[in-house]
Amino acid sequence: MQDRESRLCFRATNRIVRPFEWGLEWTREWPTTQVYPKNGHDPESYIRLLNEAGVENSDAFFEYEPPSDFRLDGNILRFTSAVHTPYPENNVVHGQWFPAKENPGAKRVAAIVLPHWNASREQHNALCKGMARLGISTLRISLPYHDFRMPGELERADYAVSANIGRTIDATRQAVIDVRSCADWLESQGYCRIGLVGTSLGSCYAYLASAHDDRFEVNVYNHCSTYFADVVWIGLSTQHIRQGLETTIDLDRLRQAWRVISPPSYSDKYAEKRKRSLFIYARYDTTFPPHLSEQVIQNARETNIDHAVVALPCGHYTLGEWPWKFIDGYHICSFLKRNL
């Protein structure tokens, strides 16, 4: 299984080792920066200060002005992201819309699907169509720097996760805010219950969004893990990023530098909300190592989160192959159908 995972992982030959950067220019628009302007701090101590302040007042860190320019063109929803970046393509959020057939008198439910890192615009669409056939209208969002939103200079979504500390935080903050903005649109269309389905990187984004938004009552985390830094440092598919990072920083310091975008920072906050959660992980995952997934589940037990667990005997990449992708899809769809 691990040999198969390695072959699937490294069939991509366009990974680039990019240099380490603190990326302080990406912090300028953060709410924490307005409260704590840089004043003689060295880059690392300033990033840590912004992380501490962001975690302490995370509602403000992930706060946003709801978009006012939602427009649905056929099956594509577009709106301007509340987070501005130097890349015009990335500043326009795209969502592919899969509406369910309306049944008079039935409650209107919807879900937002957050794909994996480097997903193409077609990936996850089959899942969305299946959910729509089950009566769950589904919006598949393009993550920051992905597919429709990818700057022309890129072949991969390298700016979403990279050895640039500030830019990675900014992309994550943008993803969380974009997802919450999608919920604003769904509410405006009359949907009374909204679920989230996040896969891999999308799972991290989904958890952060749900921890800060009561509207996401039903959540599926398809591949789950703990600290953002640990996955990047240990995971097979991010070893090129680690090569850039480890010239300057070690894992313990990286955890602190990315604390504000790490799910464990908000586990108590998540547990306080009324959520129903499904955690799916792969026993032979070399990208989201199983011991990290099991820590997530242990924390869910300790904090009394209403949750279910599915452990599949495959790996991260093989989950996208027959028969695992169909088994995975069954668990996702049936959980949403029962709980939304």
Q: Where is each model-derived feature located?
A:
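N-terminal targeting or regulatory segments adjacent to alpha/beta-hydrolase or S9 domains
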Residues: 1-82
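Proline/glycine-enriched tight loop/beta-turn segments at coil->beta junctions
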Residues: 87-93, 99-111, 133, 273-274
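Cap/lid segment of the alpha/beta-hydrolase catalytic domain
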Residues: 113-173
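Alpha/beta-hydrolase fold nucleophile elbow
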Residues: 187-200
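Conserved alpha/beta-hydrolase "nucleophile elbow" surrounding the catalytic nucleophile
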Residues: 198-203, 282
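Hydrolase active-site cap/lid region
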Residues: 205-253
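The feature captures the conserved acid-bearing segment of alpha/beta-hydrolase catalytic domains
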Residues: 234-292
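C-terminal catalytic histidine-bearing segment of alpha/beta-hydrolase fold enzymes
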Residues: 294, 298-340
